[in-house]
Amino acid sequence: AYDVVALNAASASTMISGLPFEGPVSGVRLALIDGQWVAFPRWSERERAVFEIVVAGRVVENGDVAIAMIEAGAGKNAWHLIYDEGQTKPDEEVVAGGLEAAKPFIKVICEAQAELKKIAAKETKEFQLFPEYTEDLYNRIDEIAHADLDEALSIAEKLPRQDRIHEIK
Protein backbone atom coordinates (compact mmCIF):
# COMPACT_ATOMS: atom_id res chain seq x y z
CA ALA A 1 0.00 0.00 0.00
CA TYR A 2 1.11 3.51 -0.72
CA ASP A 3 0.32 4.96 2.70
CA VAL A 4 3.71 4.02 4.14
CA VAL A 5 5.54 5.35 1.08
CA ALA A 6 3.65 8.63 1.49
CA LEU A 7 4.55 8.84 5.19
CA ASN A 8 8.24 8.33 4.48
CA ALA A 9 8.21 10.70 1.51
CA ALA A 10 6.43 13.43 3.47
CA SER A 11 8.99 13.20 6.25
CA ALA A 12 11.93 13.19 3.83
CA SER A 13 10.63 16.18 1.88
CA THR A 14 9.97 18.12 5.07
CA MET A 15 13.49 17.29 6.28
CA ILE A 16 15.02 19.08 3.28
CA SER A 17 12.42 21.84 2.88
CA GLY A 18 13.92 24.44 5.19
CA LEU A 19 10.93 24.26 7.51
CA PRO A 20 11.54 23.70 11.19
CA PHE A 21 10.82 20.03 11.76
CA GLU A 22 11.71 17.73 14.62
CA GLY A 23 11.97 14.71 12.36
CA PRO A 24 12.63 12.45 10.75
CA VAL A 25 9.82 9.99 11.21
CA SER A 26 9.28 6.85 9.22
CA GLY A 27 6.95 3.93 8.91
CA VAL A 28 6.80 0.35 7.76
CA ARG A 29 3.99 -2.04 6.86
CA LEU A 30 4.53 -5.60 8.06
CA ALA A 31 2.44 -8.62 7.17
CA LEU A 32 2.42 -11.90 9.08
CA ILE A 33 2.79 -14.46 6.29
CA ASP A 34 3.40 -18.14 6.99
CA GLY A 35 4.51 -17.27 10.53
CA GLN A 36 7.06 -14.65 9.44
CA TRP A 37 6.85 -10.87 9.50
CA VAL A 38 7.38 -9.55 5.95
CA ALA A 39 8.24 -5.86 5.57
CA PHE A 40 6.71 -3.82 2.75
CA PRO A 41 4.73 -6.79 1.38
CA ARG A 42 3.64 -6.76 -2.25
CA TRP A 43 -0.10 -6.81 -2.97
CA SER A 44 0.15 -10.44 -4.03
CA GLU A 45 1.88 -11.37 -0.77
CA ARG A 46 -0.83 -9.69 1.28
CA GLU A 47 -3.31 -12.35 0.09
CA ARG A 48 -1.50 -14.78 2.42
CA ALA A 49 -1.29 -12.34 5.36
CA VAL A 50 -2.97 -13.39 8.58
CA PHE A 51 -2.32 -10.01 10.17
CA GLU A 52 -0.90 -6.65 9.09
CA ILE A 53 0.53 -3.76 11.05
CA VAL A 54 1.70 -0.32 10.06
CA VAL A 55 4.17 1.07 12.57
CA ALA A 56 5.55 4.61 12.57
CA GLY A 57 8.18 6.11 14.81
CA ARG A 58 11.44 7.95 15.15
CA VAL A 59 14.94 7.42 16.48
CA VAL A 60 15.50 8.97 19.91
CA GLU A 61 18.76 10.38 21.30
CA ASN A 62 20.04 7.07 22.67
CA GLY A 63 19.53 5.39 19.28
CA ASP A 64 16.42 3.44 20.22
CA VAL A 65 13.27 3.61 18.14
CA ALA A 66 10.25 5.24 19.76
CA ILE A 67 7.00 3.99 18.28
CA ALA A 68 4.49 6.78 17.76
CA MET A 69 1.67 5.06 15.88
CA ILE A 70 0.38 1.56 15.24
CA GLU A 71 -2.42 0.48 12.92
CA ALA A 72 -3.32 -3.17 12.89
CA GLY A 73 -5.82 -5.52 11.35
CA ALA A 74 -6.46 -9.02 10.17
CA GLY A 75 -5.75 -9.89 6.56
CA LYS A 76 -8.81 -10.45 4.39
CA ASN A 77 -8.16 -14.20 4.28
CA ALA A 78 -7.15 -14.54 7.94
CA TRP A 79 -9.99 -16.85 8.98
CA HIS A 80 -9.27 -19.32 6.17
CA LEU A 81 -5.50 -19.14 6.68
CA ILE A 82 -5.72 -19.73 10.44
CA TYR A 83 -8.52 -22.28 10.68
CA ASP A 84 -8.19 -24.12 7.38
CA GLU A 85 -4.43 -23.96 6.83
CA GLY A 86 -3.23 -23.75 10.43
CA GLN A 87 -1.25 -20.54 10.13
CA THR A 88 -0.09 -18.67 13.22
CA LYS A 89 -2.74 -16.81 15.19
CA PRO A 90 -1.66 -13.24 15.90
CA ASP A 91 -1.70 -13.35 19.69
CA GLU A 92 -0.11 -10.71 21.93
CA GLU A 93 3.34 -12.29 21.74
CA VAL A 94 3.27 -12.52 17.94
CA VAL A 95 2.13 -8.89 17.57
CA ALA A 96 4.83 -7.73 20.03
CA GLY A 97 7.33 -9.54 17.82
CA GLY A 98 6.01 -7.60 14.85
CA LEU A 99 6.53 -4.31 16.66
CA GLU A 100 10.11 -5.29 17.40
CA ALA A 101 10.58 -6.39 13.78
CA ALA A 102 9.45 -2.93 12.65
CA LYS A 103 12.09 -1.03 14.62
CA PRO A 104 15.15 -1.78 12.43
CA PHE A 105 13.25 -0.65 9.34
CA ILE A 106 12.13 2.57 11.03
CA LYS A 107 15.70 3.22 12.16
CA VAL A 108 17.25 2.66 8.72
CA ILE A 109 14.69 4.89 6.99
CA CYS A 110 15.15 7.66 9.58
CA GLU A 111 18.93 7.42 9.20
CA ALA A 112 18.58 7.66 5.41
CA GLN A 113 16.47 10.80 5.80
CA ALA A 114 19.07 12.31 8.14
CA GLU A 115 21.74 11.63 5.50
CA LEU A 116 19.54 13.18 2.82
CA LYS A 117 19.21 16.27 5.00
CA LYS A 118 23.01 16.55 5.25
CA ILE A 119 23.43 16.64 1.48
CA ALA A 120 20.26 18.30 0.18
CA ALA A 121 18.55 20.41 2.84
CA LYS A 122 17.81 24.08 2.51
CA GLU A 123 18.76 26.27 5.44
CA THR A 124 16.15 25.98 8.18
CA LYS A 125 14.14 29.14 8.57
CA GLU A 126 12.48 30.24 11.77
CA PHE A 127 8.84 31.21 11.65
CA GLN A 128 6.96 33.01 14.37
CA LEU A 129 3.93 30.86 14.94
CA PHE A 130 2.06 33.15 17.31
CA PRO A 131 2.54 36.82 18.13
CA GLU A 132 3.66 37.67 21.62
CA TYR A 133 0.59 38.50 23.68
CA THR A 134 0.99 41.28 26.17
CA GLU A 135 -1.31 42.52 28.89
CA ASP A 136 -1.84 45.69 26.82
CA LEU A 137 -3.00 43.62 23.84
CA TYR A 138 -5.42 41.60 25.98
CA ASN A 139 -6.81 44.83 27.46
CA ARG A 140 -7.22 46.42 24.02
CA ILE A 141 -9.08 43.38 22.64
CA ASP A 142 -11.30 43.32 25.73
CA GLU A 143 -12.02 47.03 25.27
CA ILE A 144 -12.95 46.58 21.61
CA ALA A 145 -14.88 43.31 21.67
CA HIS A 146 -16.12 42.53 25.17
CA ALA A 147 -19.49 44.29 25.09
CA ASP A 148 -20.33 43.09 21.57
CA LEU A 149 -19.33 39.50 22.36
CA ASP A 150 -21.35 39.52 25.59
CA GLU A 151 -24.37 40.63 23.59
CA ALA A 152 -23.74 38.07 20.82
CA LEU A 153 -23.23 35.17 23.21
CA SER A 154 -26.52 35.96 24.93
CA ILE A 155 -28.46 35.21 21.72
CA ALA A 156 -30.23 31.90 22.37
CA GLU A 157 -30.71 30.77 18.77
CA LYS A 158 -27.63 29.21 17.24
CA LEU A 159 -27.67 30.65 13.70
CA PRO A 160 -28.38 34.26 14.69
CA ARG A 161 -25.72 33.94 17.42
CA GLN A 162 -23.16 32.63 14.91
CA ASP A 163 -24.06 35.38 12.43
CA ARG A 164 -23.55 38.06 15.08
CA ILE A 165 -20.20 36.61 16.18
CA HIS A 166 -19.13 36.53 12.53
CA GLU A 167 -20.07 40.21 12.17
CA ILE A 168 -17.95 41.09 15.20
CA LYS A 169 -14.89 39.36 13.78
Residues of each region from the PLM?
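Polyanion-binding surfaces on beta-sheet-dominated domains and ring/shell assemblies
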Residues: 1-169
